[in-house]
Amino acid sequence: INVLKNTDGLAYLSFISDHGTAIYDDGKSLYGGNTKGNYNIAHFFWFNDLYHKQHPELIQKLSINKDKKITSECFVDTSLELSFIESKIKKGCSLLNDKFIEKQRLVKNGKVYDFDQDL
């Protein structure tokens, strides 16, 4: 982040984890187990001062959706929009959409589970 702070021009950093980790969540410590802790993933954005100054509306839109249930598929669409890249491959899952609609979150561990109902 310190490198990006000193970058001329717009800069942002986005991170998404490929998996979560259950460390005594619900009294369990399981690697690869079928628990919410193993499926909850870290996802964050950081913006430099110039990005905040020139595009506060985009950061506000992210803030509006910060507590919504999302999946990792939202990462690509959101990153394309934050980078001002036009693409025909968007899936309609950008966190910059102020009318963002939560989708059913499914996980697979031998069989398909509804994250919010079954785990």
List each language-model region with its residue ranges.
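Catalytic domains that recognize anionic headgroups
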Residues: 1-119
